[in-house]
Amino acid sequence: MPIVVDHEQRRREVAEVAADLIARRGLERVTVREIAAATGFSTTVVSHYFKDKRELLMLAYRLAAARARRRIDAARGDGVQRLRLSVEAILPLDEASRRDWSVWLAFWSVAATDAEFGAEQRRRSRETLDLMRRLVAGALGAQDADATAAAERLLTAVYGIAMQAVFDPARWPAKRQRDALAAELATIAPRNDVRRRAAGGSR
């Protein structure tokens, strides 16, 4: 009997290998030949699933975004505690999330000058902002306009913290990232509420 190959699963497998290589070596230095060698497939097979490296990067980016969303959805707790844990799920606190951030940064470097990638990045950013807005509104009972403004400040802070941590991990370990996030949350929610309701997740 012929072997049935799951086309989408094979594409995901190749994209995950590409993500590992991009995280370690950078987008410009990674070649389709190198990706093929790392997967154990020929370049012909890889080219069958992806027409070029751009298409590979797009899927690697989407898979990283999906993993981040699963981490956010796994956050438990109520109010500010859930908000804090959800936002922490975006930060590069461990090896897996640092890898995802390396892929995102590679994608952003292309998105800055590429219309298709730029549109994808704007769509993802707006989805993340809307999610943060709903979490802020749920945590603080804020009106829509206030929740949107707070979510924008929070997401801006998260991007800044994350990029510092990716570029200088020795100075930005997980604890410092969490502390910086807590300081930002304290500007959004009443300080005593942040301390009381977020304390449970930091013990």
Model-derived regions, located:
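Short, basic, alpha-helical segments at the C-terminal edge of helix-turn-helix-like DNA-binding modules
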Residues: 62-67
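Solvent-exposed, amphipathic alpha-helical segments
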Residues: 17-24, 70-71, 103, 107, ...
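Hydrophobic/aromatic-rich alpha-helical bundle segments in the mid-to-C-terminal region
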Residues: 117-122, 126, 139-203
